[in-house]
């Protein structure tokens, strides 16, 4: 197209980014990529390879080595042997290495960006302007965290060896999210990148060599899901961090249960995007374009559920459709393209199938009229309205450029619709009323809520989910604690208390007292209709306790879940109640000590010390109740990031036989 024609039509011209240097880097490796283990990039003999292709045209980029069990063992062993020295060198020395990585990422930023786009299919402007700068930011931030660890976190130490598995939607950024805090705190790492997108991780391995990272501190193993499964189950791993689907996260949790490994899961989402009638609609439309069509909607926190207040719904949908008409879809290496390629034909097939099946339940579909390229994996930006809140499209994560919309009447209804999901990763609230925003945001069950914005990420602000979106935080001070454990004096091993047996005949001690269950603020008899005897160390019957069954457990969990007023109560009130419990326990100190003696057979002094410790714990937790403050994070945006503490929810506790009262408190 000539300049004159461009000026007459005002159409976008092509602005292609060169892939020459990235392809030269691949050719330098003869098109075959190895593993990074113990400071060396290698391809062990006899290994299989799998292909990685450019999703925009289906052409082969490179062949990636499939790691074996022996390779995983070697990587974990290298990390284990390197960990004591890495932690022992101290935070300031580790900080220099992280700083070097940050500088090298900036020096090679264009190569990283181009390689990321070739491998993943996201537009080059997203890789260049968003992903890579944020990768460097994470290493800069965590270099500072390492520098200050001994002053600011002197009561913490590294966990050990971290096994990390990352997804294909943000390959290098997820690598930085995982590796930077882990090595900053003195851990060593074995990381597995996604099968579809391993190239930037292998380029990162090369800059680790350039930065002089000690052998074994960082290890990269490539392969399919079988490699990840073996890695997280490896007995040499102390900490597992995974970002990916909820289904795989659930399997990981089951696989490592009982192994004593620390775990962070950042899983799927179905994030709500709330637009109130007083919002700046034009800004909200632009924000929505970023929320759902950024990275082709392949974002765990994508604002894929749109809720607009009824009074402005028609206007907002019209503006949104007009904006969709202007979206450019095509070669992600074109700097003027808005929406790139889906990462793989399998993912494209999954998106198509979910949408077609979901539309059978109802809904009106509108697609961007932009012409799709003939080759590659592309899906048009899509809006589906007039769907039921319980339908599949509204409830299931599509992980593609598909937006599902509905309306609401009142703020209370908006909150109810937004929380009507099994996920809880993020949310966006659009309103010009700051009072409304500050009222709505804390009511949303999610890890992150953005006000008049979306997809705001920074290394200084923690990110993570609730419900089936996972647990744990990455980024900020919260993310540092995910890779440390407290330093404390060795605990004394408690002697095991054996169950006492004896005669079921009670002593003649007067009127019988029935020990019932305590559920929902009242004493209730067990649904089972059974009671179990409790004997003293001499074999005498102390009393009968109710034997709970499944229904009792269900009733107890339901009562605890419904007691939401406790979490919403003022911290001062919770503190006063805990103090009051401590006062009442103190008044009956001797009675509780006698019961402990009769049940465990311990000395009177030990029983009294246990009761005293329980009272002390109650007063300590009461003291902390109104002092557990949030934080204001310093993020490099025009705004402020507030970290607000929230209760975990309903907690199930199994008390030990040892120290029965203190264990309960």
Question: Where are the regions a protein language model picked out?
Answer:
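ALDH superfamily catalytic-core signature
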Residues: 247-388, 417, 451, 495-502
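A structural signal for short, well-ordered beta-strand elements
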Residues: 51, 65, 87-88, 277, ...
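Hydrophobic face of amphipathic alpha-helices that form TPR/SEL1-like repeat modules
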Residues: 1-56, 142, 148, 492-542
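Rossmann-like NAD(P) dinucleotide-binding subdomain of oxidoreductase/dehydrogenase enzymes
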Residues: 146-283, 408, 597, 628-665
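Glycine-rich loop-to-alpha-helix module at the N-terminal edge of alpha/beta enzyme cores
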Residues: 59-149, 539-628
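Residue-level signal for inorganic ion chemistry
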Residues: 58, 94, 116, 186, ...
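Short loop-to-beta-strand entry elements in the cores of soluble alpha/beta enzymes
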Residues: 97, 180, 184-196, 200, ...
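Conserved C-terminal structural/oligomerization subdomain of aldehyde/semialdehyde dehydrogenase
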Residues: 1, 59-62, 213, 237, ...
């Amino acid at each position: 197209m000539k300049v004159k024609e461009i000026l007459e039509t005002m159409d976008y011209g092509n602005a292609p980014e060169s892939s020459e240097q990235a392809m030269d880097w691949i050719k330098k490796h003869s098109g075959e990529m190895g593993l990074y283990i113990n400071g060396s990039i290698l391809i062990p003999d006899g290994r299989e390879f799998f292909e990685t292709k450019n999703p925009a045209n289906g052409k082969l980029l490179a062949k990636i080595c499939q790691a074996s069990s022996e390779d995983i063992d070697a990587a974990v062993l290298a990390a284990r042997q390197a960990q004591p020295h890495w932690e022992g060198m101290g935070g300031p020395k580790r900080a220099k290495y992280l700083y070097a990585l940050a500088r090298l990422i900036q020096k090679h930023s264009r190569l990283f960006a181009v390689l990321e786009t070739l491998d993943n299919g996201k537009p080059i402007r997203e890789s260049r302007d968003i992903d890579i700068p944020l990768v460097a930011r994470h290493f800069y931030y965590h270099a500072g965290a390492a520098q200050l660890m001994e002053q600011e976190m002197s009561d913490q130490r590294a966990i050990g060896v971290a096994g990390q598995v990352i997804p294909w939607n943000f390959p290098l950024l997820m690598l930085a999210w995982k590796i930077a805090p882990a090595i900053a705190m003195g851990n060593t790492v074995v990381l597995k990148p996604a099968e579809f997108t391993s190239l930037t991780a292998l380029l990162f391995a090369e800059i680790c060599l350039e930065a002089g990272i000690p052998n074994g501190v960082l290890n990269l193993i490539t392969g399919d899901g079988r490699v990840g499964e073996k890695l997280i189950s490896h007995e040499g791993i102390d900490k597992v961090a995974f970002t990916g689907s909820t289904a795989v996260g659930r399997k990981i949790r089951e696989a490592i249960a009982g192994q004593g490994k620390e775990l962070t899961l950042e899983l799927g989402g179905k994030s709500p995007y709330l637009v109130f009638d007083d919002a700046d609609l034009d800004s909200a439309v632009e924000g929505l374009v970023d929320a759902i069509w950024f990275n082709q909607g392949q974002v765990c926190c994508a604002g894929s559920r749109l809720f607009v207040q009824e009074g402005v719904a028609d206007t907002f949908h019209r503006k949104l459709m007009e904006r969709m008409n202007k979206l450019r879809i095509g070669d992600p290496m074109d700097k003027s393209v808005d929406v790139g390629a889906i990462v793989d034909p399998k993912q494209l097939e999954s998106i198509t199938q979910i949408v077609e099946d979901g539309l059978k339940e109802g809904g009106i579909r509108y697609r961007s009229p932009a012409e799709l390229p003939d080759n590659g994996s592309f899906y048009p930006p899509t809006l589906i309205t007039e769907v039921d809140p319980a339908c599949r499209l509204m409830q299931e994560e599509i992980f593609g450029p598909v937006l599902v919309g509905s309306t609401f009447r009142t703020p209370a209804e908006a909150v109810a619709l937004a929380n009507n999901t099994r996920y809880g990763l993020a949310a966006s609230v659009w309103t010009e009323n700051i009072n409304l925003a500050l009222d709505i945001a804390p009511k949303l069950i999610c890890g992150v809520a953005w006000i008049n914005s979306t997809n705001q990420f920074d290394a200084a602000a923690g990110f993570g989910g609730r419900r089936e979106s996972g647990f744990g935080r990455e980024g900020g001070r919260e993310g540092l604690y995910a890779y440390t454990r407290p330093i404390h004096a060795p605990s004394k091993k408690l002697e095991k208390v054996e169950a006492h047996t004896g005669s079921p005949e009670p002593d003649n001690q007067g009127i019988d007292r029935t020990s019932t269950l305590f559920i929902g603020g009242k004493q209730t008899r067990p649904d089972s209709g059974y009671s179990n005897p409790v004997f003293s160390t001499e074999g005498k019957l102390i009393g009968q306790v109710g034997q709970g069954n499944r229904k009792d457990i269900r009733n107890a969990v339901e009562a605890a879940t419904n007691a939401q007023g406790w979490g919403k109560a003022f911290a001062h009130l919770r503190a006063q109640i805990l103090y009051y419990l401590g006062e009442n326990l103190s008044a009956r100190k001797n009675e509780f000590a006698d019961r402990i003696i009769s049940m465990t057979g311990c000395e009177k002094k030990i029983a009294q010390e246990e009761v005293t410790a329980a009272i002390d714990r109650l007063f300590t937790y009461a003291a902390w109740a109104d002092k557990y403050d949030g934080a204001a994070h310093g993020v490099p945006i025009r705004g402020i990031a507030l970290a607000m503490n929230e209760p975990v929810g309903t907690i199930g506790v199994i008390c030990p036989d040892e120290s029965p009262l203190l264990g309960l408190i």
